[in-house]
């Protein structure tokens, strides 16, 4: 709901704000987005007022004399201040008067970044978090481990980063994707992780860590072969990414020693209530000729090797629950039918996969590749960077997706949306910008707006103002073409 009114409000660089609670964190966020220096003071021109509105809803009113943001609490005030920051970025110190009443469609509004295939610095991640906050995203899904690199310091197993964080000629993890003749890699220390978690919290964003198991574990297995390799295993398999040694063995005691230690440290580092344990792309043929796995299957009465995946993920879910955490995972966590409905399913292969999980009673985050994967190329132009395995993805396609169709009977189980950016081809900050923007703005609208208010022509009309903001922030976005 938006109504333009007459006049302008002059926003001073050091304007004062008052409110019913201490506002230092909210004002620090606003100042970070705008470069202004607002402070809290009773003699104020900007007022934050308590009101009966949805938990994340807000009402922003700008008149020539004052600015008033009404909300039920901190989340709504934050959104109102972010909208004010966008308005200030577009119009400078003379703000056109208006009234906005708004609230999000979904409570989960996420961006995913793969930092395993290519390593992205803490400075780059802070920049991304700031950009996310400007468009009211509230979850950052941090993909920290994969076949090509282990990026998180684990004090119980320093080999994970000493060995698993680096790839190159003559190293345990061989050269791949990029890096040339020199070793390539990097990892995040625990102090850096705590710093980033605190920074994100100040922007209203919760970081969800992902430790991807039981597949995508080549780097971990190379770092800890004494724990994670069964010498007698003769199983033959090949993952989608052409690894034949990237799956944890659910029958080895070392697997649980490794995972429990990792989960202990992850739970300590990330105060949020959720941990993502991957679960995707376990290849066919794994565990079939593992004596330990065959013995475990016989002991448990399992008939299908996929039940071993469920066995391992059920252990992780129960272990995390004892620490007060909820397990999240890609849609394949349902394989083997061992994970309870307290787990949240991230649907990535299709909308239908998410609808099926929601209909079965699982909470679902929608992330279908054909509609929301930002590593896909914009078009089939030979000069356009990106991947094609799920087709191409332009701005209009992102904007058009509807995660929760009106005629679906279990929409209450659909928590929100996630746009992933996998990093096989993301070798620089400029390429990161190009793949994210402006498609990330369309994801923001999908996550925030109801279908009735998500109108393509309106989005396009507002886009130049947003590109102006991105120019100010020195974002090297792709110039949009439908």
Q: PLM features: residue spans?
A:
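Acidic, contiguous N-terminal accessory segments
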Residues: 1-109, 321-334, 339, 465-482
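Generic recognition of stable, solvent-exposed alpha-helical segments in well-folded globular domains
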Residues: 25, 124-127, 188-195, 254-261, ...
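Short glycine/serine/threonine/alanine-rich loop segments
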Residues: 36, 137, 203-205, 325, ...
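Feature activates predominantly on carbohydrate-active enzymes
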Residues: 53-257, 261-274, 315, 319, ...
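Flexible loop/turn segments at secondary-structure boundaries
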Residues: 119-121, 147-153, 214-220, 276, ...
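Active-site neighborhood of glycoside hydrolase catalytic domains
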Residues: 220-226, 237-343, 348-361
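Flexible, acidic glycine-rich loops studded with aromatic residues
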Residues: 326-343, 347-482
